[in-house]
């Protein structure tokens, strides 16, 4: 594992962030299995963990594991809250929701602060003023060290930071959109923001110019880049991955990128998801990809991707042929 430092956080962050949104991490009957997976991830060097208020028992499982292992002082927690607009979620986008959900999350996580606090979704009809004010209060109280937005557009992030600068406050210093070699053809949850695709080039340029840390989710396109199915038809997609990523990503442009990733992986003697991660890490955006491997081999493969070097030409070819 490789590590990096971020201003305002006095411990190293792992180059890869461990995502905890899957059913394997929801506690209950899965709790012991989740602890074993977390132990393997820790041994592999993961120190940054992504969770959210909307992950239900996931926060409790992560908090219990960190406490039982005595790891909290070394771990970096990225927590998310306030999730308006997602299908099945009735969160109200307000300063009150931000505070109430963070404080509930802190109790579940068995901690008095999180290093990174990310607003899960946005409601562009609501002015950013009160939200920025509340986040600054939470930072002043020591409950968050840095904050930002997940599914927030560039325009709304800039609006938040413009308000903060005009009022002598701290603005967003981190974002967490989706990003991978392939791009959405269907928004899975509603209100999602991704960096992939030509339309998002201005956002990528802005993030690169400002070198704002980006903790990108769906870095393997929810399994579309897992290598479980083959574009030559020998392993049909419908038999190998869930229907959701098929609906979200399966289109000719993405099939072509996956086919090129398969070819390059074969040439380099590695796995397709390693090519996808290596491509991400070659981008000029200041990325911390979120991954969720749940087996020893997959955990090892993800970490090994950090050592895989791609040339500019290879990265361009993967994207555009």
Task: For each feature predicted by the language model, list its residue ranges.
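N-terminal binding-site loop/beta-alpha segment at the start of enzyme catalytic domains
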Residues: 1-76, 140
């Amino acid at each position: 594992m490789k590590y990096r430092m971020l201003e305002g956080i006095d411990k190293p962050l792992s180059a890869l962030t461990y995502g905890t949104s899957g059913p394997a991490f929801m506690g209950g009957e899965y709790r012991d299995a989740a602890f074993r997976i977390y132990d393997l991830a820790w041994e592999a060097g993961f120190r940054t963990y992504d969770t959210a208020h909307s992950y239900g028992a996931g926060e409790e499982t992560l908090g219990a594991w960190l406490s039982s292992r005595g790891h909290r002082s070394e771990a970096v927690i990225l927590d998310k809250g306030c999730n308006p607009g997602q299908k099945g979620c009735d969160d109200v986008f307000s300063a009150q929701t931000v505070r109430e959900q963070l404080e509930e999350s802190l109790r579940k996580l068995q901690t008095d602060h999180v290093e990174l606090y990310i607003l899960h979704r946005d409601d562009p009809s609501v002015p950013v003023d009160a939200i920025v004010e509340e986040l600054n209060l939470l930072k002043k109280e020591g409950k968050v060290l840095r904050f930002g937005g997940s599914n927030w557009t560039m325009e709304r992030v800039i609006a938040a930071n413009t308000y903060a600068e005009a009022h002598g406050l701290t603005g967003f210093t981190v974002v967490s959109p989706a990003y991978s070699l392939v791009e959405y053809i269907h928004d899975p949850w509603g209100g999602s923001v991704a960096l992939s695709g030509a339309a998002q080039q201005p956002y990528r340029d802005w993030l690169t110019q400002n070198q704002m840390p980006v903790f990108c989710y769906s870095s393997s396109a929810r399994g579309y880049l897992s290598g479980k199915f083959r574009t030559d038809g020998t392993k049909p997609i419908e038999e190998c991955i869930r229907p959701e990523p098929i609906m979200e990503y399966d289109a000719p442009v993405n099939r072509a990128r996956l086919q090129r990733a398969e070819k390059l992986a074969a040439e380099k003697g590695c796995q397709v998801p390693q090519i996808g991660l290596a491509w991400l890490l070659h981008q000029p955006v200041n990325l911390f990809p979120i991954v969720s491997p749940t087996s020893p081999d997959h955990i090892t493969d993800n970490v090994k991707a950090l050592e895989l070097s791609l040339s500019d030409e290879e990265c361009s070819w993967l994207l555009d042929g």
